[in-house]
Amino acid sequence: MDILVIGIAGGSGSGKSTITQWLAKRFGDDVTVIRHDDYYKEQHDKTYAERVKQNYDCPEAFDTALLAEHLMKLRAGESIECPVYDYTIHDRSDKVTLIKPTPVLIIDGILVLQDERLRNMMDIKIPVIYRYINPIFILISIKLPPVLMASLFSTACGKPG
């Protein structure tokens, strides 16, 4: 299965989740979104007080090797069990989410473009810089109707599926 992998990165509050939701809505059932946050490393060995003080905005906080492995499996047509991060306990939960391959896969996170392994598996890389988000969405919504936007995406990236 050919999978279009889109990486969307930017600081907290930059608008990356807004862009991710916008793209996911346009692709409909053909898209799966994976959040890099779900790949924070397990911290069962630390107390809650220690976990609260943890710096979560650095590469060492993430199990990026597992995310890279999962991307390879999805690109190979295999399903994965994605970890689920629980913000209330500042740790991974015991739950996992079964994710099946879809024609479009969006990876959303603050540092998804930082890791070379991940970048090399992405077909499209979108670094989000906050000050450009609102003007871009205003122009897109004024200038490009959704049908034309989908057509442009298909032309630029190849038709999913």
List the predicted regions and their residue ranges.
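Conserved lysine of the Walker
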Residues: 16
